[in-house]
Amino acid sequence: MSFLEFDCSDRTFEEIQIFAGFQDSNLEMLNKCFKSVFMIRDQKIKVEVNDSLDTKKVEEVIDACFSIIDTQHRLNYQDVNYICSLAFKNRLKDFKARQLQAVCKTKTGEMIYPKTIGQAILCDAMRHNEVVFATGVAGTGKTYLAVAYAVNMLKSERVEKIILTRPAVEAGESLGFLPGDMKEKVDPYLRPLYDALNEMLGLETVEKYVEKQVIEIAPLAFMRGRTLNDAVVILDEAQNATCAQMKMFLTRMGKNCKMVVTGDVTQIDLIKKKDSGLMQACTILDHIDGISIIHLENSDVVRNPLVQKIIERYAKVE
């Protein structure tokens, strides 16, 4: 039995541990992807050679893994799975060409980076455009990264507030038929945004900002008649905004205003799907300076790798 060896003597013990993963989870993912055996012995990565092993791709994957460790000081089995999938599609060069710049820092000091090529393109688009549309299925990170971008803009004092909004339609439910005041009605629908805010700012800070209206949460209908200045405005679940609502929202933009519109066009709850303002906007607003339209793919799903396979199977029958 022969082995392919990669010298890691220039790497620290901690870096090699990160490469191996918690309880060797990264090595196990490499074993699964390459149908081989990866192990670490005497500061060397050893790979069992077999007839199907593509040694060049193994080298590329190991190099890409350490590239993430060098910049982000972390690596998990989901990263490894994604890197391997890119290698098999001959797209690793695209991944390495994208300088994965941190988007924001969490309350614990951890840096948030884009994890896929699509996410890196989205982050770059948010930095360089006034209006960004991000479409993609659940789990592609579009909403999370939009919030991270908004928080970073607020922390760096480039804007004065964050506005979070979304349509009030959800699987046939109407705010008018739900109990409680407006905040109680809207809050459950914005839970993913709250979770992201809490991770990046901490619960106490989020509550303080909401109280002072530094962070504003409101249904889309409440944007009518306003001019939004010095703010990052996130419209989530935008696939359920009508064409008229989308036009109304986009024309609220004032000075120093950035808008990020996120949605999943496979999850339209409107009676007529053709009434989706997100679908119309992505069609008619393409190729306008200052507006970027990003379509995230199933390969950008960053949840459990099984989620991507589930999404692909459902897509075949829908």
Regions found by a protein language model. Give the residues of each.
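Short amphipathic alpha-helix segments
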Residues: 15-34
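A short linear hydrophobic-aromatic micro-motif
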Residues: 35-38, 293-294
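Conserved helicase motor core of SF1/SF2 NTP-dependent helicases
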Residues: 104, 108-235, 239-318
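Short glycine-/aliphatic-rich beta-strand segments at the starts of folded cytosolic domains
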Residues: 1-18
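Interdomain "pre-motor" coupling segment immediately N-terminal to P-loop NTPase/helicase cores
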Residues: 39-99
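Hydrophobic side chains in well-ordered alpha-helices
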Residues: 26, 57-61, 246
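Flexible glycine-/small-residue-rich
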Residues: 8-10, 40-42, 49, 166, ...
